[in-house]
Amino acid sequence: MSDHLVSDQAPSSPPPDVSLLLRAHADLTGESANLAVLTQGRAEYVAQVPGRHTMRTFTEVGNRVALHCTGVGKALLAAVPPAQASRLIGTAPLAAQTAGTITDPALVQAEIALTRARGYALDEGEMEIGVRCVAVGLPGTAPMAVSVSGPAARMTDDLITAAVSALSAAAAELRQQLA
């Protein structure tokens, strides 16, 4: 395994056939599906397939976002070794994107521990008001995360449960592609 696969300098190009995987998840949930990598201490979106609804979430490929307040960011933090996650989170208060953003580094650390334990991350309107995101990280590879996001009214707990199962399968398939 090359050194760049365990650093926070992941390549900015998606693995082959990732669009097919993302399309399957967008079709399953009706919501936008994303792939993000850890790049220079931020989550960088490298692929997205939009959901089928007129009102949907959209992120531009190449956009970099904070780790502490996004589903993909939390999944990325949970996918790297704990010491690296701690270094990325730091000790200073973190920037709030919404009133729901967790800004206390100790609480972010607790959220990452929960993410590791349950196997998925949630963004409950922490980056954008009214948007929920569920994401699964790919530990043991270049730090990557797959996610589904959409308006909170449609991203019900039942949809999130179904998405977690599907995203976990996608993460396993991506790990195989990268092996």
Annotate each language-model stretch with its function.
Residues 1-40:
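HTH-adjacent hinge/linker in prokaryotic transcriptional regulators
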Residues 36, 44, 134-136:
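Conserved hydrophobic/aromatic positions in well-ordered beta-strands
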Residues 45-48, 57-59, 147:
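Beta-strand scaffold of nucleotide-dependent catalytic cores
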Residues 51-53, 150-151:
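A short acidic/small-residue loop/turn micro-motif
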Residues 53-127:
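Short, solvent-exposed recognition segments
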Residues 73, 77, 81, 168-175, ...:
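Short amphipathic alpha-helical signal-transduction/dimerization elements
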Residues 104-166, 170:
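Extended hydrophobic
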